[in-house]
């Protein structure tokens, strides 16, 4: 009850402060920031009680929410833009958290299930210690309700009525984040309660109008949040039994409910949920306009250098002459062992980066959203779920089975996104919302499988989910090479269509481009590319987001040049990540997917800042 009340009230307040129906502790990365802070405290050996745990989680949650709200444009941001910014920040923070779980398994033992949100982790002592904090924060938000109502009229109107907008917004965010982090401290991050509870109350407010005022909306959302959490807990006990049901995180059920809510919201939403003007950075330099081939050639040389460094460097350094002897079959046994494992890993990183970068470029173009990537459409998560199903249910799965599972998951996600958005002409904003819901559902089911499986399979799957090239060979390389070849051939034939699709919905139709068909084709190719890369090395984030942006900044928006440079930069990024993961803490290793998140998160923060600055001009 305490957790549901805190999350429901927190979500209602955040939506009021941000004037955004999709604002919530999940979508503003509050839960991810709090989770990372608590995990980091466990890594350094800090033994936190209830209230110190709240303080640590609060610091992480406030920092994450401040970054998302500040860099996405605050109240001026569209709902989809805010959610995309929060999702990307959440990906980065979650990847860092997962890296800590992999590197420090003993110090963080038990935090995986906690990170999914479980009610059976703390006794009444923790609840009694935190309850007064929740009550004080809750009452503070209720007292702030009238000012939140006035904020809904707009900043200028609120100021004219005597509201200190900046102070009201700051106090509202701090109290809402405090409630959310109290819940995180007790049970871990329980997903989407803060989104769904206010949504239910706002639906009721269409019949009971007083519920639209925050002094009633916040308590009503608290009640709805409590009902959601209790319903999820009862459902788990009914399905898995009174004993086993306690071991399954409650956040699994609430995340599934939230996923359904996002899909329903996408179907019923009007234009207000479409992305606002898709502001991008100035694309291309003077050199790119005069001689784009020179920039592309420089990118290829960079990739060659990265590949050579990846082959030569690692826990043991080899020379170019050693590689030549290995190719000629004259190397020593030691060199054979080193290069037989290292060269396929470098090749896997190269192909996976190229596949994910091309997939990201296609998704960003057809959705006309610079913050989109295959993960945003739920494809990456669904591919990961399909592969995890195979890993968990079979003792020694072949790569063919893992690839098949990933492909099935990715295709099902793509079909769901297409099916739900087909009636609206596959509008980009709806595609994004449905994709986010699909990804949330896939992540929830993945967590359920991992929690219910044995420790051996759980550790194996968690490591794979980090995105590792370890053990890569021909079975992994061939499907990626085939998928990349198909993607490159299609892109080469349709690059002019993509130039038109990125403009608006009208221009392509006027010039004879079948827009729904084009979106279907290119998202289908993105699904294939993502499935191949995910099956080979696991989920790798930010490549499909960062590489297309960097390519556009360097060489411009003409896809004839943008797509090849995107492929080159994506391949180089994952190769660098794999090299860093193999050498930074040798002989131990970090999965490449976690390193790309660490590299990609600062770049993405800078990107959001530049985009916001550009939108103000």
Segment roles from a protein language model:
Residues 1-617:
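Alpha-helical transmembrane segments in inner-membrane proteins
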